[in-house]
Amino acid sequence: MIQQKHDLYPNLCTQFIDNSHPELYEIIKLSIGNPTNAKIHAVLENYKTLNHHLIGCLLDNRLIGIIGIQLIGLDVNIKHISVQPEYRYKSVARHLVYAVIRNFKVVSIAAETDDESIGFYNKLGFKCQLTENVYGRRYQCILDV
């Protein structure tokens, strides 16, 4: 992957992550509602399929953030994004979104989110629309690249 310097962490490494990475289970469960072992394993199995990718941020060889995406033609759907609690609000998630933009030829990025994360997507320039589904109040967010 192409590396881009991070302001706070100059030794931050962004790379593709295999779904068997030893730290992946603990970090991806942060982005899964009501995570159970079965649910987490099912999510990780999806990343074995074609057009699904995991990109991680490693700091001193420790996985501190992850973004899971699905490529659909020239579009990307963010399926999961999570950052270890001690590294939140330090631009790690933004760094992950930019890694997707730098490394895939895409025209748009979509994500579904909640009230807790809507500000993150707005700051990155996503256009977000309120929707309701079985999970309650959600937002459909789109970024034209």
Name the predicted role of every residue range.
Residues 52, 136-142:
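Short hydrophobic/aromatic beta-strand or adjacent loop that forms the aromatic wall/cage
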Residues 115-138:
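Conserved active-site alpha-helix within GNAT-family acetyltransferase domains
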Residues 56, 62-70, 75-82:
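Conserved beta-strand in the GNAT
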Residues 1-42:
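Short amphipathic alpha-helix that is part of the acyltransferase structural core
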Residues 29-60, 66:
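Active-site rim helix/loop that mediates acceptor-substrate recognition in acyltransferases
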Residues 68, 95, 99, 110, ...:
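Hydrophobic, well-ordered beta-alpha structural blocks that scaffold small-molecule cofactor pockets
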Residues 102-116:
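Conserved GNAT acetyl-CoA-binding A-motif
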Residues 83, 89-102:
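Conserved acetyl-CoA-binding loop-helix of GNAT-fold acetyltransferases
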